[in-house]
């Protein structure tokens, strides 16, 4: 199974959540370069074939994206956090539109994932606390053979699916019937 999994970034533990939820998939992750510099964690995510994006260096970012596409062609799924940074609260940040090129170029499906609760693990800087993490894995969105118009509309469609899912999880957490 090859796919691009996309969800809002809540915390450093999101990668662990993915491994638990998607044990049948071989994953590589797209992460900002700074995550690769965290002791132990950085070495671990580098070893599992993560692709590190340097936001200040467009050429290096393009090379990283091409490396991610190669990983997909080799049979890995790729998980990307479309905001490009960790959320410091319950609401997803602004999505980076270019993130979906990793799926549209090789023509693999996008699997939107809504995640709630992981941001709570790092509410206090420097302290790791337990948190209930809930996840909705949405239906795959095919990308093979999309027209330019469909490809251009894709980021907004994926963002809406993810954000609506996060809101549903938040409503459930608060005991509100969202449906």
Indicate where each model-derived feature is located:
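Non-catalytic C-terminal accessory region of glycerolipid acyltransferases
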Residues: 62-179
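Residue-level preference for the first positions of well-ordered beta-strands
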Residues: 2-4, 50, 75-81
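Alpha-helical membrane-embedding segments
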Residues: 1-8, 164-169
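Catalytic core of membrane glycerolipid acyltransferases/transacylases, capturing the structured
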Residues: 3-58
């Amino acid at each position: 199974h090859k796919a691009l999994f996309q969800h809002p970034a809540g915390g450093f533990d999101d990668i662990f959540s993915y491994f638990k939820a998607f044990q049948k998939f071989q994953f590589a992750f797209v992460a900002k370069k700074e995550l690769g510099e965290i002791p132990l964690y950085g070495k671990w995510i580098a070893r599992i074939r993560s692709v590190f994006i340097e936001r200040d260096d467009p050429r290096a970012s393009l090379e990283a994206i091409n490396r991610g596409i190669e990983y997909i062609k080799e049979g890995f799924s790729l998980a990307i956090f479309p905001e490009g940074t960790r959320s410091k609260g319950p609401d997803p940040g602004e999505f980076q539109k270019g993130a979906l090129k990793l799926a549209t170029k090789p023509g693999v499906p996008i699997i939107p994932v809504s995640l709630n609760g992981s941001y709570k693990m790092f509410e206090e800087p420097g302290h790791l606390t337990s948190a209930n993490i809930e996840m909705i894995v949405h239906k795959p969105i095919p990308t093979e053979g999309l027209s330019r118009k469909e490809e251009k509309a894709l980021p907004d469609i994926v963002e809406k699916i993810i954000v609506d899912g996060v809101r549903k999880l938040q409503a459930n957490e608060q005991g509100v019937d969202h449906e």
